[in-house]
Amino acid sequence: MKNFHRSFLLGLLGLLFTSLAVAQKPAKPSAADLHQAIKKLNVLGSILYVAAHPDDENTRFISYCANEKYYNVTYLSLTRGDGGQNLIGPEMRDLLGVLRTEELLMARSIDGGKQRFSRANDFGFSKNPEETLGFWDKNEVLSDVVWAIRETRPDVIVNRFSHDRKYDTHGHHTASGMLSVEAFDLAGKADVYPEQLKYTETWQPRRQFYNTSWWFFGGQEAFNKMDKSHLFSADMGVYFPLKGKSNNEVAAEARSMHRCQGFGSLSTRGESLEWFDFIKGDRPQGQDIFEGINTSWSRVKGGEPIGALMAKIEQGFKSDNPAASVPDLLKAMQMIQQLPDGYWKTIKLAETKDVIRGCLGIYFDATASAPTTSPGQQVKVRLEAINRSALDVQLNALSIRPSLKDTTTAFALINNKGFILNTSITIPENAPYTAPYWLQKAATIGMYNVEDQLLRGVPETPRYATVRWMLTVQGIPIEYESEIAYKVGESSIGEVWRPFEVLPPVFVECTESSYIFSDKEKNVSIRLKAGADNISGTAGVQVPAGWVVSNVGDNTFNFKKKGEEKTFLFKVSAPSGPTEGELIPFARIGEKEHLMRLITIEYDHIPQQSVLQSAKVHASRADVRVSARNVGYYMGAGDDIPAALRQIGCNVTMLEDKDLDADNLAKFDAVVLGVRAYDTKDQLVFHQPALFEYVQKGGTLVTQYNTSFNANSPSLAPFPLKLSRQRVTDETAEIRLLLPEHQALNRPNKITSADFSGWVQERGLYFPTEWDQAFVAPLSMNDPNEKALDGALLVAPHGQGQFVYTGISFFRQLPAGVPGAYRLFANLISLGKEGEKP
């Protein structure tokens, strides 16, 4: 038998439990929840749903499988969505991937599904699967799909996207279908990825489908007219009496967790068909895609008596006395324990134990006295256990990890009489920091680097600090594990939970995300924050060879309390001529240098997340001149362009709705609207007259990309223009200067082809395809083998001023420190201005 123990120890994080993020707050299942969980104990079916990104999943189908069919249904998202946009905040790239991971986990906590990932990195929009698989390591991503199949053992695999090129919607989408179809046949072969078989076994699914939809066929009307006799269908509109909701209502709640993508959904009720196109395997004779699949206990050798007992438990369940089911549940648990090791034994044993705990009304609470700690530090921990039933429950022992602190209690958990233990643990000096495991090693543009096979696919890093509770119930031993978390009472909210995390003793960061140097030295400030009490050392900045750094004043720190901060100033100068490199701030404690910055991701719909990133920042020596001294910036969805503009000497004022009147705007040389401003700020449309009046009187207005527009206004501009979904995804695509003498390409910086080298992820997106003759288009670009797109940058005079609309991804380029992007953006905000400021 394979090493199922460690494999499932990690795998359960994503398979048996919805998410550790959700588990931070101890579960309190209702009688209806328990009744549904008992029904599930007697169903041994598994479904794997495969797509490319967070929010690609069909929450209606996932909820239907989990709550109507009682199957174990897992969503395999090949990426974590790092390359997308963010509608609710500034997180991009890796940080966006962390946010979208948590949104997926919250969605699964609602629809009842489980979650897995591959190591594929979302590098941004891709126009075809060949490009996608060129950036992804096809063999490695394919191995992850095979691993997911072997770990989840699906009877049926359902792909969100077709593997057929004629249905291309996005290269990642089509690639996900292609990889799933290939993996279907490979997962059952022992000579394919044999290294996985140290931990799991081969598995051959029964059949595979493509979850088709009207939006692949040009609309609902066209889909209604097409011949669907070859398709399979199922009604997703079923009603769940135990939930008091229809499946569609549950699905809408789950989909609405994808807030950073703007996918809040209205709930619907009534019949609603979902359609499936057969791909391979044994084709059902009827309409049921699960036809002929044995999902009873008889599929497990020796399991039939367990199925009979589970049926008895379900029939005899009493909602006003769930504990009455516990004696039979204990018998079922013991029968499962006697089965040979295997997938369903592990799954159903864990599910049965969870139901027993819920029926007993047992509550476990393990909370630390602080939300964070550091290696070597001692932390107070409060442990609470209570049994809210009349059954005999004994708490025999506790084991706290990682301190290996065991406590023998022999405490009788009498009905509603709680057990409380206040203790402390010491975090080992070699304890790993709490951080997303897939971000621990350097990644490529298309792949994350995860060496541990058993971590691959797990949604989150396993929590380091846990408590094992060793009980006997009616004389029968049973163990549970819970993570140590942190909770606090907030007067306006009540009980607030967050993860308990092990973090470095000190964090360090530059105060800017990138630096642009001229021929003058520049002030570089770094900020230190204590992650532990009583730490001291020195701060500094490492610079590239040929650069010069000197500290201004004392560079020592002596923090008495965790949370203290101190800022240090350094003078840095770059060598002459164009050059690029990295500035690396550090805090030295003894012989160890600490090089990490801490980013906290905090929204009310996900658990708070701490991410550790390298504190290094990009620095370049470039000739960037700007004539606009005073710039007003109206933030949209969130970006870091204001800080970038300050790097080149602009005085940036952040604008709110109340500031958008023509008289107030007159003091600015230029006004910039942040990315997706019209998408995210409903009031902005009402300020258009003032903005356009500002332009008429001599101002420069730069409007960055939007994806849609408020129907209350005919245009984003003083003149008509029509947005599209056209984009250039190749960041190295040739840029043609259509109007080389236009002021946007000449003053104050002469723009050449060299200014478009070193760009990141993409050139731009959502370019206009139609525009008024008042506009000129200075640039043209396109992805390989595609037609030229001239709408990336549009400039129009309006009265005495200049209006600019651009889909160029400045929001990615400026924070990345791309010199040419700085030079071009400086020209845009300087349109119509006299003089140059180096």
Region spans (language model):
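Aromatic-Pro/Gly-enriched surface loop or interdomain linker
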Residues: E593-G674, Y705, R812, S830-K837
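The feature marks non-catalytic terminal segments
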Residues: Q24-P26, D33, L186-Y363
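Catalytic beta-strand/loop cores that center a nucleophilic Ser/Cys/Thr
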Residues: R725-G817, E836-K837
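Active-site beta-strand->loop->alpha-helix modules in alpha/beta enzyme cores, enriched
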Residues: Q24-Y193, W214-W215
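A glycine-rich, often tryptophan-bearing local segment used as a flexible ligand/cofactor-contacting loop or short
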Residues: R676-S757
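Long beta-sheet-rich domains in secretory-pathway and surface-associated proteins
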Residues: S369-S620, V626
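Bacterial N-terminal signal peptides
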Residues: L10-S19
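Bacterial N-terminal signal peptides that target proteins for export
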Residues: M1-L9
